[in-house]
Amino acid sequence: MSKNVTMNVRDAISASEAECFVTIEGKRYNFMSAINLEAKMEKTKSEIPILGRTTKGNKTTGSKITGSATFHFNTSIFRELLYRYKETGEDIYFDIQVTTEDPTSSVGRQTVILKDCNMDSGIITKFDADGEYLDEDMDFTCEDWELVEKFNLISGTM
């Protein structure tokens, strides 16, 4: 009986070992106030009837990219974008770059750039007399993304 190969615990990526930068109109901001961020690509599929089969096939016909972030309520960068839209009607798109790298892991780092992101909504103002700290959530869409750096394969994967 062969020995089962398992993942080395050090290759589990620490959840907080990341960098996040936002680029708006050529200005690059260190988005260190981010608490979490997640972006995903959802494929659009159509059911395709196939003669001679009782099951339908599924064909990918497109996709959309959405994301969400939670960050500390200590920056006005995104409120400025909302205010600018309110005042001028100009909707500003921006890029988000996320690098995930845990120095303990052997997989190295991964860098993704979310391109042409656009906020769905945003907090204008906020307080909480009973809270510990203030944070805010932001949902957004993206037009594209790029995998700039990818993780190395975990030892034993192949």
Where are these regions (language model features)?
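Short acidic DE-rich linear segments
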Residues: E149-M158
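Short, flexible coil/linker elements and helix-boundary hinge sites characteristic
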Residues: S16, T88-G89, N152
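Short, acidic/charged, Gly/Pro-enriched secondary-structure junctions
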Residues: L82-I113
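Charged, amphipathic alpha-helical segments and their flanking helix caps
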Residues: M1, T104, T157-M158
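Solvent-exposed edge beta-strands and adjacent loop segments
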Residues: S2-L81, D116-D139, E146-L147
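Edge beta-strand at a domain terminus
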Residues: M138-F140, S155-G156
